[in-house]
């Protein structure tokens, strides 16, 4: 599988291409503090088998990409969106199907607004619309209060995950088990959690990065202003919003709320899916994405 190191200003980004470069390009944008390896190989193989040349990459401050001193050189979502475009440039891709999860969901919306000519389609999941103040909703959840947005706040599982990540872990074994426990909580209660499956993935991700320590920098990045949500009405890219029905971070109807703000956007609900990508959801998730990309190219 070919890899490329791509430079965007002073940042170097690790990226990987899978499949036939002659096939329709599809860019995967991972969640916060996650590397390219957060997209499971088995899931990527389904996208490749459906006729896509899949590109995945490490966000800055993850995996094998550049580490930044955030205090001295802070960055935000505009820079992360520029990184995604730099990856496309690095693979000589003029326009691609884009799939973003969690933090990548936000980046995808910004790309649809600011660089629509680079998107063939957009699929977003495991996140909210730009007009939702997630930080305010999270604070409300911590206080046991209703959300500012009127949408469901993150669940207790998500709050438990945040608390768990603050607990000390020193050895590689402790760090690994904490990573697995994080995914158990994010997985939700719909799909039975396979600890061995996620342990294998986390060993792969840690080996890729060269450390069991998890990045935390993306937690410091301010969200885009909610005023940008009003701009979603001018999006012309075909958009699919996937609602994971057991997502503890962005419960239903967050995807429906997002789709209602974008002309022509569609919603697909995936039963039992949480804020994770266990093997059990790969088939319906890949099928939904590929049906969306095919429909846009007919």
Swiss-Prot record:
A single MF term (Gene Ontology): carboxylesterase activity
Pathway connected to this protein: Antibiotic biosynthesis; daunorubicin biosynthesis; Antibiotic biosynthesis; carminomycin biosynthesis
SUPFAM superfamilies from the UniProt entry: alpha/beta-Hydrolases
Domain AB hydrolase-1: 25-277
InterPro entries documented for this protein: AB_hydrolase, AB_hydrolase_1, AB_hydrolase_fold
Enzyme class: hydrolase
Record field: catalytic activity: rhodomycin D + H2O = 10-carboxy-13-deoxycarminomycin + methanol + H(+); 4-O-methylrhodomycin D + H2O = 10-carboxy-13-deoxydaunorubicin + methanol + H(+)
GO biological process, one term: doxorubicin metabolic process
Family in the record: Belongs to the methyl esterase DnrP family.
Name this polypeptide is given: Rhodomycin D methylesterase DnrP
Gene assigned in the entry: dnrP
